Design a protein with these regions (language model features):
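Nucleotide/phosphate-binding catalytic cleft detector across ATP-hydrolyzing
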Residues: 1-140
Length: 140
Protein backbone atom coordinates (compact mmCIF):
# COMPACT_ATOMS: atom_id res chain seq x y z
CA UNK A 1 0.00 0.00 0.00
CA UNK A 2 1.62 3.18 -1.17
CA UNK A 3 1.59 6.85 -0.43
CA UNK A 4 -1.47 7.54 -2.59
CA UNK A 5 -3.59 4.45 -1.91
CA UNK A 6 -7.21 5.49 -1.68
CA UNK A 7 -8.68 2.37 -0.10
CA UNK A 8 -7.50 0.13 2.71
CA UNK A 9 -9.05 -3.31 3.00
CA UNK A 10 -9.48 -4.88 6.41
CA UNK A 11 -11.24 -7.95 7.76
CA UNK A 12 -12.67 -7.77 11.26
CA UNK A 13 -13.80 -10.55 13.55
CA UNK A 14 -15.90 -8.91 16.27
CA UNK A 15 -15.80 -11.39 19.10
CA UNK A 16 -17.37 -11.32 22.53
CA UNK A 17 -13.94 -11.90 24.12
CA UNK A 18 -11.48 -10.60 21.47
CA UNK A 19 -11.62 -8.59 18.26
CA UNK A 20 -9.21 -9.37 15.45
CA UNK A 21 -8.33 -7.17 12.47
CA UNK A 22 -6.57 -8.59 9.44
CA UNK A 23 -5.05 -6.60 6.58
CA UNK A 24 -2.80 -7.80 3.78
CA UNK A 25 -3.28 -11.38 5.02
CA UNK A 26 -1.81 -10.67 8.47
CA UNK A 27 -3.37 -10.27 11.89
CA UNK A 28 -2.50 -6.70 12.83
CA UNK A 29 -4.81 -6.29 15.84
CA UNK A 30 -5.82 -8.95 18.36
CA UNK A 31 -7.23 -7.20 21.41
CA UNK A 32 -9.86 -7.85 24.09
CA UNK A 33 -13.30 -6.53 23.09
CA UNK A 34 -13.36 -3.86 25.80
CA UNK A 35 -13.60 -0.08 25.69
CA UNK A 36 -13.15 2.50 28.48
CA UNK A 37 -15.32 5.62 28.30
CA UNK A 38 -15.47 8.81 30.33
CA UNK A 39 -18.85 8.78 32.13
CA UNK A 40 -19.29 12.55 31.78
CA UNK A 41 -18.29 13.10 28.15
CA UNK A 42 -18.71 9.55 26.74
CA UNK A 43 -15.33 10.01 25.02
CA UNK A 44 -13.20 6.92 24.49
CA UNK A 45 -10.25 6.76 26.87
CA UNK A 46 -8.80 3.35 26.01
CA UNK A 47 -9.57 0.26 24.00
CA UNK A 48 -8.49 -3.38 24.06
CA UNK A 49 -5.89 -4.52 26.58
CA UNK A 50 -5.46 -1.01 28.04
CA UNK A 51 -9.20 -0.75 28.69
CA UNK A 52 -9.29 -4.26 30.16
CA UNK A 53 -6.55 -3.30 32.63
CA UNK A 54 -8.68 -0.33 33.74
CA UNK A 55 -11.69 -2.51 34.61
CA UNK A 56 -12.72 -1.86 38.23
CA UNK A 57 -9.36 -0.24 38.97
CA UNK A 58 -9.96 3.27 37.77
CA UNK A 59 -11.52 6.55 38.67
CA UNK A 60 -15.29 6.55 39.26
CA UNK A 61 -15.79 8.69 36.13
CA UNK A 62 -14.40 5.95 33.87
CA UNK A 63 -16.49 2.95 32.90
CA UNK A 64 -15.30 -0.12 31.04
CA UNK A 65 -17.71 -1.88 28.71
CA UNK A 66 -17.77 -5.14 26.78
CA UNK A 67 -20.03 -3.99 23.94
CA UNK A 68 -20.71 -7.49 22.57
CA UNK A 69 -22.68 -10.24 24.27
CA UNK A 70 -23.22 -13.69 22.78
CA UNK A 71 -21.68 -12.51 19.52
CA UNK A 72 -24.03 -9.54 19.00
CA UNK A 73 -23.82 -5.85 19.79
CA UNK A 74 -25.27 -5.07 23.22
CA UNK A 75 -24.10 -1.43 23.33
CA UNK A 76 -24.09 0.27 19.92
CA UNK A 77 -22.18 3.42 20.93
CA UNK A 78 -19.52 1.50 22.87
CA UNK A 79 -19.07 -0.91 19.94
CA UNK A 80 -18.62 1.98 17.52
CA UNK A 81 -16.03 3.59 19.82
CA UNK A 82 -14.21 0.27 20.26
CA UNK A 83 -14.12 -0.28 16.50
CA UNK A 84 -12.76 3.24 15.93
CA UNK A 85 -10.04 2.71 18.51
CA UNK A 86 -9.01 -0.67 17.13
CA UNK A 87 -9.00 0.59 13.53
CA UNK A 88 -6.64 3.39 14.60
CA UNK A 89 -4.18 0.68 15.68
CA UNK A 90 -3.95 -0.58 12.09
CA UNK A 91 -0.78 0.73 10.47
CA UNK A 92 -1.69 3.71 8.30
CA UNK A 93 1.56 5.64 8.69
CA UNK A 94 2.52 5.16 5.03
CA UNK A 95 -0.32 7.34 3.77
CA UNK A 96 -0.42 11.00 2.93
CA UNK A 97 -4.02 10.98 4.17
CA UNK A 98 -6.37 8.46 5.77
CA UNK A 99 -7.65 6.01 3.15
CA UNK A 100 -11.29 5.01 2.93
CA UNK A 101 -11.92 1.63 4.50
CA UNK A 102 -13.35 -1.42 2.78
CA UNK A 103 -14.37 -3.71 5.62
CA UNK A 104 -15.38 -7.36 5.74
CA UNK A 105 -16.88 -8.37 9.08
CA UNK A 106 -17.67 -11.89 10.26
CA UNK A 107 -21.07 -12.15 11.96
CA UNK A 108 -22.85 -15.12 13.60
CA UNK A 109 -25.08 -17.02 11.18
CA UNK A 110 -28.11 -16.65 13.47
CA UNK A 111 -27.95 -12.85 13.55
CA UNK A 112 -31.24 -10.98 13.21
CA UNK A 113 -31.82 -8.10 10.78
CA UNK A 114 -31.59 -5.66 13.70
CA UNK A 115 -28.25 -7.13 14.83
CA UNK A 116 -26.87 -7.04 11.27
CA UNK A 117 -27.94 -3.41 10.91
CA UNK A 118 -26.19 -2.59 14.22
CA UNK A 119 -22.93 -4.18 13.01
CA UNK A 120 -23.13 -2.39 9.64
CA UNK A 121 -23.99 0.97 11.26
CA UNK A 122 -21.17 0.62 13.80
CA UNK A 123 -18.69 -0.15 11.02
CA UNK A 124 -19.87 2.79 8.92
CA UNK A 125 -19.71 5.18 11.88
CA UNK A 126 -16.22 3.87 12.66
CA UNK A 127 -15.04 4.86 9.18
CA UNK A 128 -16.00 2.00 6.88
CA UNK A 129 -17.03 3.21 3.43
CA UNK A 130 -17.79 -0.21 1.97
CA UNK A 131 -18.95 -2.74 4.58
CA UNK A 132 -19.56 -6.40 3.78
CA UNK A 133 -20.90 -8.95 6.25
CA UNK A 134 -19.96 -12.63 6.10
CA UNK A 135 -22.32 -14.98 7.94
CA UNK A 136 -21.17 -17.73 10.27
CA UNK A 137 -17.49 -17.06 9.71
CA UNK A 138 -14.61 -16.42 12.06
CA UNK A 139 -11.37 -15.04 10.61
CA UNK A 140 -9.28 -16.37 13.47
Amino acid sequence: MGLFSFTQEIAMDLGTANTIIITNGKIVVDEPSVVALDRRTEKMIAVGEKAKLMHEKTHENIRTIRPLRDGVIADFYACEQMMRGLIKQVNTRNHLFSPSLRMVIGVPSGSTEVELRAVRDSAEHAGGRDVYLIFGYSFS
